[in-house]
């Protein structure tokens, strides 16, 4: 990261039009590809719906009002107001509401665990979205070219493998095409919808909520089951909030209301219109509404759109993991920047290959998009419920709304969310168990790391020596001073770094300038360079340098030293500076803390994390690592 964070997505602030186009290409990919499978799943034979014009009107009415209430009202109008210095998403919202509660209170722990669990469920989404999106697009070959049906899974696997293989090179160049391609996709959706709407305009009666309510009342059990499939039109709604920091709330709102929502509505109503005249089209309503001559081009366009939707989710997984590392919930991992122009363009090899294996496994195991649809909703509904809870806390604690108003708004949204959540629980046995298992495993790992780090800090403080009195005593009877600068990286400036104690014990020297450098992650996404550094002169050429970072930034030692030169007048010659880092070996023990098996898991995670020198981007030939053992 080599640029100011005051404009953290683009180097030059583009026009609103360019931001809207960018948002269309990135933010709406997931929700924009739902027409490929959502209505098809609603009329699945397994739901037992007696096909009739009333059933079509009822389902389309449910789709329409679900999108209005959940996306347009809940997310676009209310939730997107809950920004953390412009950033959105469940982790940013969690950090925002945690500022309003006592740090170590029970309420803070509950809110933290809710936020982390909601974030972890995104990993389930990150696995299923590429699989179901690309698979459903390629399944169009079964209609466009039936002789190629046997190649649907191999083609899907090749596309997905290629998508993950190019991640290491970055997608900044291709990203310029995302906006135009997705714009063409949405216009195609709208055009197809209009084509069938003019043939059966009576489908527009579904705008009246009477049809949704009547369907729910008269077909209670079947309607409740179908509700889980109706939710598929909402997958990707959370992305509007998550990507708010990249494009801003206004461009996303414009993109939604001007292009995306109208085109989606037209397409869903068009699919419904086709079903009124051709009930057999329920087998695959999206592709069967496409004229024969346009089948192959539509398969190609749909494949491009689903690849773009998958890319957005993969990038989201990288970003989420990076945030979790900065907030102290995951060990350090290698983070590579794939674009000099966009801070958001990062690549984490471990996450990339793990996602690739899981996505390929899911496609091979589930085989068809309708099988994956059962697994899709549960992860997204869980995150939505948690977002609603945290947003309600924000309304009361941050915005200071009247409790009665918070209760009315919060209750309205939570009832809708819980209805979808309950309907999706029915699908747990059919595949919903997979994202739940994946999210729960991620949550367990994150909480194990968080708890293990707390234990490690507690042990270090118990055995630690207060820093400033130690330095005062050391300077009173100084060891031999040598030329150059020693930078000791430490997580706690209150205690003497173990690396300094080892250096004094074995080398018996002290550099002419000693800097204790610590990185502190704030509960905001970005910290401006003017407020990043603070320095305390302890005397005798010894300094305590604190560098603050936001949870969406990655510390960079070279950048800190350059900033210290510009802002504080502390010049560092890199080739005359040695960086001392303590490499801790964690030893599980029977001391009070976590169960032994969980401490062993933490020790394994600690051992396999990226080296501090790699993570902090320190030249390898300037690093001195000193090992130490710590029992927890």
UniProtKB/Swiss-Prot annotation:
It is a multi-pass membrane protein. The chain crosses the membrane at residues 19-39, 59-79, 110-130, 146-166, 178-198, 213-233, 256-276, 298-318, 346-366, 373-393, 403-423, 428-448. This is Probable potassium transport system protein Kup 1. Its main location: membrane. It comes from Cupriavidus necator (strain ATCC 17699 / DSM 428 / KCTC 22496 / NCIMB 10442 / H16 / Stanier 337) (Ralstonia eutropha). The keyword Nucleotide-binding does not apply. The gene is kup1. Belongs to the HAK/KUP transporter (TC 2.A.72) family. It comes from the Bacteria. Transport of potassium into the cell. Likely operates as a K(+):H(+) symporter. HAMAP family: Kup.
């Amino acid at each position: 990261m080599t640029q100011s964070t005051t404009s953290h997505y683009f180097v030059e602030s583009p026009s609103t039009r360019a931001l809207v186009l960018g948002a269309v290409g990135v933010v709406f990919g997931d929700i924009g590809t739902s027409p490929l499978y959502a209505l098809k799943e609603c009329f699945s034979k397994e739901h037992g719906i007696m096909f009739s014009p009333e059933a079509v009107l009822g389902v389309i009415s449910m789709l329409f009002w679900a999108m209005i209430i959940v996306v347009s009202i809940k997310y676009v109008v209310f939730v997107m107001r809950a920004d953390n210095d412009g950033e959105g998403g469940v982790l940013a919202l969690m950090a925002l509401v945690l500022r309003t509660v006592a740090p170590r209170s029970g309420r803070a722990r509950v809110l933290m665990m809710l936020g982390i669990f909601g974030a972890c469920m995104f990993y389930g989404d990150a696995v299923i979205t590429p699989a179901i999106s690309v698979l459903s697009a390629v399944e169009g070959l079964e209609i466009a070219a039936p002789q190629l049906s046997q190649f649907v899974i191999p083609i899907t696997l090749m596309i997905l493998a290629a998508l993950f293989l190019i991640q290491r090179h970055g997608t900044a160049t291709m990203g310029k095409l995302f906006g135009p391609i997705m714009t063409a996709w949405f216009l195609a959706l709208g055009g197809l919808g209009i084509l069938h709407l003019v043939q059966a305009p009576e489908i527009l009666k579904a705008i009246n909520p009477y049809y949704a309510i009547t369907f729910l009342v008269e077909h209670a059990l079947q309607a409740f089951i179908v509700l889980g499939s109706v939710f598929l039109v909402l997958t990707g709604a959370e992305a509007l909030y998550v990507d708010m920091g990249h494009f801003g709330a206004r461009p996303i709102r414009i993109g939604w209301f001007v292009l995306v929502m109208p085109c989606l509505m037209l397409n869903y109503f068009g699919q419904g219109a086709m079903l009124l005249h051709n009930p057999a089209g329920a087998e695959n309503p999206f592709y069967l509404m496409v004229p024969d001559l346009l089948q192959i081009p539509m398969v190609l366009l749909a494949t491009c759109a689903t690849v773009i939707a998958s890319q957005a989710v993969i990038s989201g997984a990288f970003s989420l993991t990076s945030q979790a590392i900065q907030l102290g919930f995951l060990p350090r991992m290698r983070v590579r920047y794939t674009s000099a122009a966009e801070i958001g363009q990062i690549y984490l090899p471990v996450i990339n290959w793990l996602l690739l294996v899981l996505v390929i496994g899911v496609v091979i195991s589930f085989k068809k998009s309708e099988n994956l649809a059962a697994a899709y909703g549960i992860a997204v509904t869980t995150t939505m419920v948690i977002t609603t809870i945290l947003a309600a806390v924000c309304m009361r604690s941050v915005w200071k709304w009247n409790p009665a108003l918070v209760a009315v708004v919060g209750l309205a949204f939570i009832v809708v969310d819980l209805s979808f959540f309950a309907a999706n629980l029915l699908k747990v046995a059919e595949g919903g168990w997979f994202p739940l298992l994946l999210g729960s495993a991620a949550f367990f790992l994150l909480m194990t790391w968080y708890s293990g780090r707390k234990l490690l800090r507690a042990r270090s403080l118990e055995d630690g020596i207060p820093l400033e009195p130690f330095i005062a005593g050391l300077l009173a009877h100084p060891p031999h001073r040598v030329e150059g600068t020693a930078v000791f990286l430490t997580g706690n400036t209150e205690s003497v770094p173990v690396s300094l104690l080892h250096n004094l014990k074995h080398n018996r020297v002290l550099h002419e300038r000693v800097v204790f450098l610590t990185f502190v992650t704030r509960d905001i996404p970005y910290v401006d360079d003017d407020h990043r550094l603070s320095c305390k002169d302890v005397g005798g050429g010894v300094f305590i340098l604190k560098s603050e970072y936001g949870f969406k930034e990655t510390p960079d030692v070279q950048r800190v030293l350059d900033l210290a030169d510009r802002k504080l007048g502390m010049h560092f010659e890199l080739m005359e500076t040695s960086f001392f880092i303590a490499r801790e070996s964690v030893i599980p023990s029977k001391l009070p803390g976590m169960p032994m098996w969980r401490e062993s898991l933490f020790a394994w995670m600690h051992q396999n994390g990226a080296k501090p020198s790699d993570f902090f981007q320190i030249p390898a030939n300037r690093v001195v690592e000193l090992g130490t053992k710590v029992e927890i």
